[in-house]
């Protein structure tokens, strides 16, 4: 069974986007390509256990096993060695991507303290959107009692949009709560 949001996009939202953006061919309408969830763990330099806990939490949030990112080169000022683990990242595609986006928009973002909407300016010029989340505990999959340290994560939504207006229209139709 396809994800709820994907079915809604195929049946209803694609036609609305085509009409709004003036496209004739359904393949011209922008769609989600992938979502990259990244957790940078600079403090893992001193404490290796942080990586394991973060990988576990990221797997719970996304439903997919993360890749541990390693330092490309040594930087003495940061006490960083080449090959040392400094983060974790997951690339979501297909149904998992739509389900994660649905949970992010409908459950996680409304749980952020003093949430007034996400910035409409965080597009990169090519229709992709990046969002920073300060606390991983906004996701219902994370058990607050088992969290040792509150960490943030970056979520990048990659779309097939050609420019920011198309990307903004797509995310607005998919339910992203932009600030007014």
UniProtKB/Swiss-Prot annotation:
GO terms for biological process: translation. Signal peptide: none annotated. Disulfide bonds: none annotated. Keywords: Ribonucleoprotein, Ribosomal protein, RNA-binding, rRNA-binding, tRNA-binding. InterPro entries: Ribosomal_uL5, Ribosomal_uL5_bac-type, Ribosomal_uL5_C, Ribosomal_uL5_CS, Ribosomal_uL5_dom_sf, Ribosomal_uL5_N. One of its GO terms (molecular function) is rRNA binding. One of its GO terms (cellular component) is ribonucleoprotein complex. Gene3D superfamilies: 3.30.1440.10. This is one of the proteins that bind and probably mediate the attachment of the 5S RNA into the large ribosomal subunit, where it forms part of the central protuberance. In the 70S ribosome it contacts protein S13 of the 30S subunit (bridge B1b), connecting the 2 subunits; this bridge is implicated in subunit movement. Contacts the P site tRNA; the 5S rRNA and some of its associated proteins might help stabilize positioning of ribosome-bound tRNAs. Belongs to the universal ribosomal protein uL5 family. Part of the 50S ribosomal subunit; part of the 5S rRNA/L5/L18/L25 subcomplex. Contacts the 5S rRNA and the P site tRNA. Forms a bridge to the 30S subunit in the 70S ribosome. This is Large ribosomal subunit protein uL5.
